[in-house]
Amino acid sequence: MNYGTVKFFNDSKGFGFVKDNESGKDYFVHVTGLIDKIKENDEVTFEIKEGNKGPNAVNVKLA
């Protein structure tokens, strides 16, 4: 499990980015990968899953 911070999330478009606290990497997150509703600067936990265009944050929930 990874811990991070929501950098950006657009509710109307259904996607955003989460920054991993340990590695500093940004991961794409799609609305289908959410467990909880998120907004910018929320602290979250997530898993990383390989997607069509690289790694994505999935099972994203508030920490």
Briefly describe each language-model feature range.
Residues 1-8:
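Structural detector for short beta-strands of small beta-barrel domains
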Residues 3, 26-28, 43:
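Well-ordered beta-strand positions in beta-sheet-rich domains
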Residues 10, 22, 50-52:
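A generic beta-sheet turn/junction motif
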Residues 13-18:
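Short aromatic-glycine-enriched beta-strand elements
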Residues 25-36:
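Beta-strand/loop nucleic-acid-binding surfaces
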Residues 34-45:
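Short nucleic-acid-contacting surface segments enriched for D/E, G, S/T with interspersed K/R
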Residues 49-63:
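OB-fold/S1-family single-stranded nucleic acid-binding modules
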